[in-house]
Amino acid sequence: MVFLFAKSFVGMLFVEERSLRRSLSSSELTACVGLVFVEGVALVGGLERVDDWRGTKRSYFLYLEVVFFLEDWELLEMSKAGALDLASGLGGKIEKDDVLSAVDKYEKYHVCYGGDEEERKANYTDMVNKYYDLVTSFYEYGWGESFHFAPRWKGESLRESIKRHEHFLALQLGLKPKQKVLDVGCGIGGPLREIARFSSTSVTGLNNNEYQISRGKALNSIVGVDQTCNFVKADFMKMPFPDNTFDAVYAIEATCHAPDAVGCYKEIFRVLKPGQCFAAYEWCMTDSFDPNNQEHQKIKGEIEIGDGLPDIRLTRQCLEALKMAGFEVIREKDLAVGSPVPWYLPLDKSHFSLSSFRLTAMGRFITKNMVMALEYVGLAPKGSQRVQLFLEQAAEGLVAGGKKEIFTPLYFFLARKPQSDVL
């Protein structure tokens, strides 16, 4: 049965993935989506009998194509949309034969595998690099080019909210055309490209992961910002820039990977021009977090292992770190508070959306089985299923943390470097 599933899933999905998308019109998709959806759901629940599989697999794959087409139609911009794309990127720059060993080493940094916070902080470069080599392909497959959350309005799509969240940061910084801007921990550059085009600025992306930089450069070239935007491979605790280099600096859910917030913010302070601003969205535990509550600690641990974090700071600790680094805090707010649509909704298994299908319970179930099939036939490296598993664990922790209001990925602050930067 496993072989039949692997052979059918991998073979048919790869062959039909783009051909169906090209051959079906939007009206045809609208006409068939209801029927195909029902048949797809029936298949998911009926894999016990081979006859059922053979009789419905065409409808199931058509269903997948309807969903993936609609994702494009809804402008989710999945830059690596296919199963082959996912398979080819798994492991990043790690040799395929070494992926399983890298997963073992990464997991051992975390509490549930015997690791501790001090070890994670001491080895944060290795831990975070392994993490992003292992997960970037999954992120891009399921989330798109911008690896972050956003507060949402009712009726607003996930992709629209992500763009607005990036524009908000640019507007808070007051970016002007031709300014030199630094994106600290830029991922594959989704926000970098969006903010550069929105504000007509030149953005440098700082990242310590070689695989993500290679993806970012390729995507910059595709959209035509490779002449105005660039990437630098470096540790944000030791930036290779002269003092007072940038007109503005921002970080989107990235400096949470720093082992020391004060040290990271001091480096940002150093490379920022006097009188200019630093804005960020930070991952934080809120004041509702109780370190003596075992359930709270379990949720925190799930987020840490699933998201490559040495620790998760409290909002007030980030605020204090900014001041210790020399910044004047202009404003700060947890944007999760009062958001009409919860930031964690795309990860909530009770939520279903065609436009963000791959993040739903059914979409994640399909991805799980697809990864199993890819690994079984040798197209994905051994260890890929375990990466998918700790990402599932992260999703559960994030949703639980959001619902209990003990965690936020949306702690926003805007801080200024004084005209006189003598501390």
What are these regions (language model features)?
Residues 76-141:
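N-terminal auxiliary segments of SAM/dcSAM-dependent transferases
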Residues 145-146, 151-179:
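Conserved alpha-helix/loop element of class I SAM-dependent methyltransferases that forms part
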Residues 180-182, 192-238:
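Class I SAM-dependent methyltransferase SAM/SAH-binding core
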Residues 185-189:
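Class I SAM-dependent methyltransferase "Motif I" SAM/SAH-binding loop
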Residues 237-248:
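A short acidic, Gly/Pro-enriched loop at the edge of an enzyme's catalytic core
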Residues 247-260:
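A short SAM/SAH-binding and catalytic strip from SAM-dependent methyltransferases
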Residues 262-277:
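A short glycine-rich, Lys/Arg-flanked "PGG" loop and its adjoining helix->strand segment in the class I
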Residues 291-410, 416-422:
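Substrate-binding/catalytic lobe of Class I Rossmann-like enzymes that use SAM or dcSAM, i.e.
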